[in-house]
């Protein structure tokens, strides 16, 4: 740390304190295994599949974006 000004060392101490606080927060988080998280996600998706319009299509009569059918008549 030769040639370093006191301001820079103070800033690095402040940054180190912030990092320590962040690491303490992350260490205290409750973690679960990826396999359990994936299983929970699949269970949730299966339970809510009937409510998902991308899986269960909206009935044509209720679809506001359906194509309008135009009939041409020759006079």
UniProtKB/Swiss-Prot annotation:
Keywords per UniProt: Cell membrane, Lipoprotein, Membrane, Methylation, Phosphoprotein, Prenylation, Transducer
GO cellular component, one term: postsynaptic density
Domain of life: Eukaryota
GO biological process, one term: G protein-coupled receptor signaling pathway
Known function: Guanine nucleotide-binding proteins (G proteins) are involved as a modulator or transducer in various transmembrane signaling systems. The beta and gamma chains are required for the GTPase activity, for replacement of GDP by GTP, and for G protein-effector interaction.
Family: Belongs to the G protein gamma family.
Subunit structure: G proteins are composed of 3 units, alpha, beta and gamma. Forms a complex with GNAO1 and GNB1. Interacts with SCN8A.
Stated name of the protein: Guanine nucleotide-binding protein G(I)/G(S)/G(O) subunit gamma-3
Provenance organism: Mus musculus
Gene expressing this chain: Gng3
């Amino acid at each position: 740390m030769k040639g370093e000004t006191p301001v820079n060392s103070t800033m690095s101490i402040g940054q180190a304190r912030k990092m320590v606080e962040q690491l303490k927060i992350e260490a205290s988080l409750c973690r679960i295994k990826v396999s359990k998280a994936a299983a929970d996600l699949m269970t949730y998706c299966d339970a809510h599949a009937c409510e998902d319009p991308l899986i269960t299509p909206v009935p044509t009569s209720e679809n506001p974006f359906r194509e309008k059918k135009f009939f041409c008549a020759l006079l």
